[in-house]
Amino acid sequence: FEKVNPAHPDKVADRIAGAVVDLAYKNEENPKIAVEVLIGHGVCHIIAETSVSLDKADVTAAVHRIAGNLTVDYVEVPQDGHLANNQADGVRCGDNGIFKGMPVTEEHKRLSQIARDIFSVYPYDGKYILDGDRLILCQSNAETQHLRKIYPDAEVNPLGDWMGGTDVDTGATNRKLGSDMADSVTGGGLHGKDLSKADVSVNIYAFLKAQEIGEPVMLCCAIGDDTVDGRPYAE
């Protein structure tokens, strides 16, 4: 199982995408929006397909709050008319998709806690892997010897100290789904989308149901479906 922290460039991109979606919800009760973000080396590129017109100044402020003083390239295009009509008289499944929910394992919980503990001390780009008894910690801007004292059996920064962040790496939306969803990864990403998108709502529903029943959950839907797993999609 691999886990990255909130300062990993891919997660920074996810956070920016989520912030843009939040702006849409401030403007409309049920906006339709899909956001893609590419960030790195001083620039943040954003494309938003949306029913809402957003102020670029607000988008830029969100980027600066999350990622620092970057140059923001923001492109906004209207939602496709056929897709808009699909939701005209009620919330329906916004895309075809397959979805899987898997119970969280003790390994997942352990590594997630390790990631939180390290990030609380070193709030910088980091990636961590747990494979049985093998623990690999790659943490930027950290005192390697300090981490080795806390985790004496871990492989810490195998190539030595490193800086990380968007000055040395790029980040893109939905590129760390394994970190987000562990064994529940399927075809669609969670980030940068409104709640009518099945990649958000049905993925989360399947995950939560798997935790509730302690068994895998497999679902699928077609664009336009108004029920999933026997329940109204609008729920």
Give the residues covered by each predicted segment.
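A domain-level signal for the structural core that forms small-molecule/cofactor-binding pockets
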Residues: 1-235
